[in-house]
Amino acid sequence: MELTEEQFQRYARHLILDEVGEEGQEKLLAARVLVVGAGGLGSPILLYLAAAGVGTIGIIDDDRVDLTNLQRQIVHATKRVGELKVDSARATLAAVNDGVRIETHPMRLGPDNAADLIAGYDLVADGSDNFATRYLLTDLCYRLKKPLIAAALSPFEGQLSSFRPYLGDGHPCYRCLFREPPPPGLVPRCEEAGILGAVAGVMGTLEAVEVLKELLGLGDSLDGTLLIYDALRVRFHRIRIAKDPDCPTCGVTVGAATS
């Protein structure tokens, strides 16, 4: 793929980076990324991936824009309240970069559609806000050998990691960290607990950085590490994630059974 004159100008600040250059930008333009959720995390992920020139971006979300979303879901606007989030996000991304292909999936990700959707993309960025989706993505990205970049939010904190458990030893999955979802109601959702809107922006932007690094093969990966952000104390810290040999998704027994 040869860059056009317009692309040379648009991506000029990428092209002057030795770590990116023309070859890296061509990788981004050829990449296909599925973003799960067009909410607080998904908004900055989508905006930065589109601006960076990720060639095809899939968005899956079955929700509609609500006025309460606009405090943190910056890919949407007041005039789009009531619209499907995937349509609202597509309009915003087209205004940012009309050279990017946006594929919308106005549905809830579930066992009946997830495998077919994920199979069509190179990488999955999880911006969802529920445990069922998180565990479904964990299991299917392992099975389909797709990198999974995932973040989670609480009122003043965020967590972020990258998962490539299909690479074997030293590469844990989400279930190695949290084997099973917590009991229903134990962890309140955003509409119950609240959130400082900019915290979602910080974590979604960091997630976009990790997606771009994964696509470009740059720097250190968060694979095997959980990054935790504490906004009130202005702290980041990292926790190593050990690969669980008994993990029901990627453990030794599972690998032996499927090999």
How would you name each of these model-derived features?
Residues 1-259:
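Adenine nucleotide-associated cytosolic modules
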